[in-house]
Design a protein with these regions (language model features):
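Venus flytrap/periplasmic-binding-protein-like
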Residues: 9-10, 16-19, 96, 137-156, ...
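Extracellular/periplasmic Venus flytrap/periplasmic-binding protein
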Residues: 16-17, 25-135, 172-179
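Sec-exported extracytoplasmic/periplasmic mature domains
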Residues: 2-6, 46-50, 78-82, 86, ...
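Segments of small-molecule ligand-sensing domains
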Residues: 190-203, 214-285
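Extracellular/periplasmic catalytic domains that process cell-envelope and extracellular macromolecules
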Residues: 1-5, 21-22, 54-55, 108-110, ...
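A structural signal for well-ordered alpha-helical segments within the folded catalytic domains
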Residues: 39, 125, 207-215, 232
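Extracellular/periplasmic periplasmic-binding protein-like sensory domains
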Residues: 24, 31, 131-210, 289-297
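Short helix-terminating capping/connector loops at secondary-structure junctions
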Residues: 52-57, 136-137, 195-197, 226-229
């Protein structure tokens, strides 16, 4: 991307260090990087406990995919454990994660207050089903950004009821931009996906991605002219992204997309999540936007 000067949009994923656009000028982990992800989850757990100071003495276990992605946040969890006084444990699940009996039996013995699931693919429903089998409650498990879709919970059946996860793009069709898509695309039959997919987590991620891309192009063309943009010009457009609540309301995405402010040095721009809970059929929002501790994380 850097050699070719073509922006690479790694929305909600990619290595955390690519957040610094001064070092990685053409990579944009928009909205949420892995460090922000776990920081926001810990902040939510603190909120549920009655304040971050109440985390002292609590037990938080992270069960993670055995890959560089899964391991990336281990030092951040340990840093937050030291800061707030909770006990952190890390449990690895080798890829692909279709056998987790030993890991969840160990978790049950340890009796953590919360489990953070940093999964991938088949690992997610297997984790939920195995937790249920050994008696660990689903409503004390919080899935990360790769453990938050309908596809992650439906295969687990009733065991998934109560399971929590984070999201940067809540499911649902109530947002004005989704209603416009329904009116102009879905209802006239111009869509190319099953109707039940409309408004799901991954569908709404696509909508958010589209909003961010179009806004970056709009800003760049306002500066450089309505033409085919170069990679350098489009990079400039992404670095000018500004979404406050006023602008989010204008594009019909208030509540669907978090407030964002990007810059040359900050290619994430947000660092917030919402919590959602699976009721057996749909995800239900259970929190407003919860911000990561970016002041702590950015120097790292």
């Amino acid at each position: 991307a850097t050699a070719d000067k073509i922006p690479l949009i790694t929305i909600n994923h990619g290595r955390t260090d690519t957040t610094d656009g001064r070092v990685f000028p053409y990579i944009f982990p928009l909205q949420l990087n892995p460090y922000s992800e776990v920081s926001a989850i810990v902040n939510y757990i603190g909120q549920q406990a009655g304040g971050l100071d109440k985390l002292k003495g609590k037990k938080i276990t992270v069960i993670y995919h055995g890959s560089p992605y899964g391991k990336e946040t281990i030092p951040i969890i340990d840093l937050l454990a030291k800061k707030y006084g909770f006990q952190a444990k890390h449990v690895e699940v080798p890829h692909p994660g279709n056998e987790q009996q030993a890991q969840w039996l160990a978790i049950r013995r340890d009796k953590p207050d919360w489990v953070i699931l940093r999964g991938w693919g088949v690992m997610n429903p297997v984790a939920i089903k195995t937790a249920h089998k050994v008696g660990y409650p689903a409503n004390r498990i919080i899935g990360n950004i790769w453990s938050n879709s309908e596809e992650d919970v439906r295969p687990a059946g009733d065991a998934a009821k109560g399971f929590l996860s984070i999201t940067t793009h809540p499911s649902g069709t109530q947002f004005p931009v989704l209603q416009q898509i329904k009116q102009h695309v879905i209802d006239p039959g111009h869509g190319n996906l099953p109707a039940e997919r409309f408004g799901t987590v991954y569908y709404n991620l696509g909508v958010v991605n589209g909003i961010l891309n179009v806004e970056a192009v709009r800003l760049a063309q306002a500066r450089f002219g309505v033409k085919t943009l170069s990679g350098e010009e489009l990079r400039w457009g992404f670095e000018q992204l500004r979404f406050d609540n006023k602008r989010l309301k204008e594009v019909g995405a208030l509540g669907l997309l978090q407030p964002l402010k990007l810059s040359c040095a900050d290619h994430e721009g947000g660092g917030a999540v919402r919590l959602q809970q699976w009721d057996g059929q749909h995800w239900q929002p259970v929190s407003d936007w919860i911000q990561a501790d970016r002041a702590l994380l950015r120097p790292i």
